[in-house]
Amino acid sequence: MEDIGNNNFEIIDDKSDEKNDENFEDKNSRNNINEEQILSNQQQQQQQQQQQQQQQQQQQQQQQQQQQQQQEQQQFKNEVINTLHPKQPNNEYSLSSLSLSPQTPQINLSEKLISDNSNLNSNSNNNNKDIESGIQTKIKNIENRRNSINSDSSGTFNNEITNGRSNDNEIININNNVGVQVTFENICYKVLNKKYNEQKKIIKKLESGKIDIEDIESQVNKLPIDRIIEKELTILSNVSGIVEKGEMVALMGPSGSGKSTLLDILANRKSTGTITGKILVNGKEIGEAYKMFCSYVTQEEVFLETSTVYETLKFHADLRLPDMTDTEKDIRIKQVLKDVGLDRKLNSKIGGILPGGMIVKGLSGGEKKRVSIGCALVTNPSLLFLDEPTSGLDSLNSLKVMKVLLELTKMKGVTVVCSVHQPRPEIFYLFSNIMVVLKGRMVYSGSNILEYLSSIDSNYKCPPQMNPADFILDVCDEIVNNPSQYSTTVDTWEKYWKHEIQPTISNDPINIDIPKRVGFIYQYWVCQKRSYQSFVRNRVVFFSKIVIAILIGLLFSACFGTVGYDGLDQNEAQSVSALFFFIITSLNLLPYSSISTFVSIRTLFNSERASKIYHPFPYFIGSMLIEIVSSFFVVLIITTIIYCIVHLRWSFEAYILSLISFYMVFLASVFMVIAMSNIAGTVDLTFSYCTGVSVVLVLFSGFLVPINSLPDSFGWIHHIDYLFYGFSSIVIIQYRDFEFQCPQPPIPCLYSNGNNLIEFLGLKNWEYNKSIGILTIWIAFFYILAYIGLYKFNKEKR
């Protein structure tokens, strides 16, 4: 038993030793962990201390920078007082809380504006704070503008854009000689009120008792008679603003606010209404020379689809830069294409859908917009106006186009003004200045519109995740619906414009170099060359005319090919007369296939005429020459096929005279269709007009009803029917002194010769030369009418 107990005791001792060893190891491991934690804590403390030191250093640097900025601001404010507001005896203003020299009264501008505004608004205490905070914001805007001008004068431009803008640390040289400052003062625009005359007529009828009240009850809501309607509608009223050189300005406002109207007036593109006010370039009125400084890019891209990018710009360069050589024009065009990012698309076609339905592959929508910008930049303008440059483009192409415009302001010093509606935030922050037009009045112009709106009302703060453009339009809507707020906003801007902005108008000298106008002959040559290129490249339309001419010739030849094979008798003579009638009728209807072409070309012409690239007359002559030449080949094919198959009077003289008659008829029809398309302006109206005219022409052409059989009441109509003169000329050529074969008795011989048939048709006293002469007069008439329609009707009205 003792042995067993001793053994157990030994076992217990062994276990206790093992436990002691384990405890010792645990203690060591814990000690190691504690040491590691201590080391890591020490390292963290050291890092925190280093971070604190860095933060302190950054704070010190920021404080130093703020102090420097405050000093610079104070210096600038002193400069503003001395430069913009010179000392005057008893009337002098200061910016915000800045005072003048001790010798003069210290009048605060914000206090001056507040006192003026208190006469207009009973709630002056609240509005005064808003106005004063708005003035403070405007001071910041002037400081920013002054800083940008200082940076420009040093020949460098530092583009550091935040809040969605691109970062660009490159220093770019600016050509300040290109840019100009544009100021517009008290711009007013009025148009005639159509309802004024309507109301006047109704009131006159009511006074005379010729109309009852019950008859006009349906019109009372649309045309009130209880108040006098103004004779003119005011679209813009006393709009003033300033655009500095090298700025990219956004002209914003709700739909119908007048922003597009203001843009058209600034771009000298308004063709209707009454415009008053002044537009100054570097503080000077320069009259017609203003056109030399600006270019305009329309919302729609209208180009010739078959032209290349280079040819499109070359066309503008040839007509706008007459003093340049071809080599200089080539260099200018390639530089412009490089500026707009199209240097790799030099020989690419514009592309689009041709009038015949053929699709020409070409540029994308954004690239076409850049071509429009390139055409405007060919003349190296100082001002570039764009109407909705992002309209119809996706977000990516819109951003690309706007970045191109931004680069132009930096690289070339070009001043860019765009009318925009709701740009995306990335585009909004690209603009250096924002102008807001509301109900035909200017309510803001500056670089910090969001701060300005918040200064007007504390509720006008843009949420961080909201598009600033959407926010601005929402605020504009609220201001419009609040008459007192709208009146206060407009008055505040007008007072600020008068006292703060207007004195900063530049007086820099202007070097006006008005280029010579291109001569008519050169304009004709350039337009004719482009028309020829388009004609050659659009082969579908021309070949379709050729195919139709061949089919008409073969079809008529198949139907009348056996006539007169054994000699022409009186029955076959009537068939040949029917052949002549159908040929002339076909030649009258064949130009209808080109109506869509004529209308589409008219759209291009209107766009180019609005830009005053060329005079309409040389353009018209150049484009009509192509129609004259192509028409001859169509008539030549039809006449030759019929003369070779149908047994007509064969002689070279008869063939040539017949060809002339058919060609004159076809040419008159072509010019008639062109005249109708120029007057109507649309494909549908042109078809309607031409169809009505053709029915009358065919009916009185002299075949269906001989002119001797027409009643006296409307028998004169054949005298104004050019188809009649064509039909009479061809009948005289074929039948005069031509012997017919008489039938065997008892069938009477009605026409023993062609003279009898000519007499039956009432053409006894007609001569070939007389018919051709009158036909020539009709061709000249339609030619002149086509030009008048091009020149006077369906102009681009803006």
From Swiss-Prot:
Any one GO MF annotation of this record: ABC-type transporter activity
Q: Per the record, where are the segments of Basic and acidic residues compositional bias?
A: 12-29
In the bilayer, the protein is annotated as: Multi-pass membrane protein
For region Disordered, the annotated ranges are 1-51
Spans traversing the lipid bilayer: 540-560, 579-599, 628-648, 656-676, 687-707, 713-733, 771-791
Keywords for this entry? ATP-binding, Coiled coil, Membrane, Nucleotide-binding, Transmembrane, Transmembrane helix, Transport
Polar residues: compositionally biased ranges = 30-41
Where's the ABC transporter domain?
A: 211-464
Protein's UniProt name: ABC transporter G family member 4
Q: Which organism is it from?
A: Dictyostelium discoideum
